[in-house]
UniProtKB/Swiss-Prot annotation:
This is Aminomethyltransferase. Belongs to the GcvT family. GO terms for cellular component: cytosol; glycine cleavage complex. It catalyses: N(6)-[(R)-S(8)-aminomethyldihydrolipoyl]-L-lysyl-[protein] + (6S)-5,6,7,8-tetrahydrofolate = N(6)-[(R)-dihydrolipoyl]-L-lysyl-[protein] + (6R)-5,10-methylene-5,6,7,8-tetrahydrofolate + NH4(+). Keywords: Aminotransferase, Transferase. The glycine cleavage system is composed of four proteins: P, T, L and H. It comes from the Bacteria. It comes from Shewanella frigidimarina (strain NCIMB 400). The keyword Transferase applies.
């Protein structure tokens, strides 16, 4: 039996088409994925992300534990509320999950992990926590609503209390603040400004309705996927998993190599991979007709005339750009042009850094 979020009935009220998403009954769209996508790029849309897993890490060793657990370094977080993104690696430097960590106090951090990886994440975190003076607490009583788009903050402001508006005023990206019952963070998965709001389940329906009344359009997983792909953001299980290291997933920037004495899990393996060289994740753009899709083969010829092959990890039509885009894992040495095999013929594609749209505009 699929799990339902606390907002399930609100989705049905808005005529959502529900699908099974890793054991959760979630809205794929509310009638038009394209309209929902454009709402986020041009105005404001919201997503039920209550299936995400919120974990609080507390205790005197909280910082030391997370410095061991994560490839990014939480010691960089010194201002309460500041967050960072990064990978949780196994000993072979494979990505167990990608996650966001918020620094609340020296003895309290909040970690948000993916829903599809919840069970293995919690098992891994608890196993590693045994050697530290920490308490790992899952927070299933919390729901989460993402409000995204150029007008998202203004529309959310009409719903927030005066105290909450004061708390978020001037807040930079990748920060979170607890104000009354809401934990409001300037994070997202769309390439637009906005908030991810962690709210007690008992208040989630009222918050969703208030945002609806403020003119925020409900958006499903379909639009969420095309938005995150345009923004060049990875989807766990598709663009990376435990067989992939962060350097091959465009996550090298999230690995904190300094200080060199910090012995995070997977460091030795990743050091060896870095020295040997690894595949990389690139963006592909195809301006002719057709749609680039997951698992299609990518071919290119290097400077020495040797042909290499890679694979598309995520691909879709881009509603913002009007043609197809993709992310692909390829051997290093790829140039500005490659070919993708479609319907038994090869089609030329442009190769770019994997970021296509930012703040509603073409990013390349």
């Amino acid at each position: 039996m699929a799990s339902k979020t606390v907002l399930f009935n609100k989705h049905l009220e808005s005529k959502a088409k529900m699908v099974d998403f890793h054991g959760w009954e979630m809205p794929i769209n509310y009638g038009s994925q394209i309209e929902e996508h454009h709402a986020v790029r041009q105005d404001a849309g919201m997503f039920d992300v209550s299936h995400m897993t919120v974990v609080d890490v507390t205790g005197s060793d909280a910082c030391a534990f997370l410095r061991k657990l994560l490839a990014n370094d939480v010691a960089k977080l010194t201002v309460p509320g500041k967050a960072l993104y990064g990978g949780m690696l196994d000993e072979n430097a494979g990505i167990i999950d990608d996650l966001i960590t918020y620094y609340l106090t020296d003895t309290h951090y909040r970690v948000v992990v993916n829903s599809a990886t919840r069970d293995k994440d919690l098992a891994w975190i608890n196993k590693q926590a045994a050697a530290f003076d920490v308490v790992v607490t899952e927070r299933p009583e919390l729901a989460m609503i993402a409000v995204q788009g150029p007008n998202a903050k203004a529309k959310a402001a009409t719903v927030f209390s005066a105290e909450q508006n004061a708390a978020v005023e001037g807040m930079k990206p990748f920060f979170g603040v607890q104000s009354a019952s809401l934990f409001i963070a300037t994070t997202g998965y769309t390439g637009e400004a906005g908030y991810e709001i962690i709210v007690p389940e008992t208040e989630a329906e009222a918050l969703w309705q208030a945002l609806l009344d403020a003119g925020v359009k409900p958006c499903g997983l379909g639009a969420r996927d095309t938005l995150r792909l345009e923004a060049g953001m990875n989807l766990y299980g598709q663009d990376m998993d435990e067989s992939i290291n962060p350097l091959a997933a465009n996550m090298g920037w999230t690995v904190a190599w300094e200080p060199s004495e910090r012995d995070f899990i997977g460091r030795d393996a990743l050091t060896a991979i870095k020295a040997a060289g690894t595949d990389k994740l690139v963006g592909l753009v195809m301006e002719e007709k057709g749609v680039l899709r997951h698992d299609m083969a990518v071919f290119f010829t290097d400077a020495d005339g040797v042909e290499h092959q890679g694979v598309i990890t995520s691909g879709s039509f881009s509603p913002t750009l009007g043609y197809s885009i993709a992310m692909a894992r390829v051997p290093s040495g790829i140039g500005a042009i490659a070919e993708v095999e479609m319907r038994k013929k090869r089609v030329n594609v442009k190769v770019i850094a994997p970021s296509f749209v930012r703040n509603g505009k073409q990013a390349f």
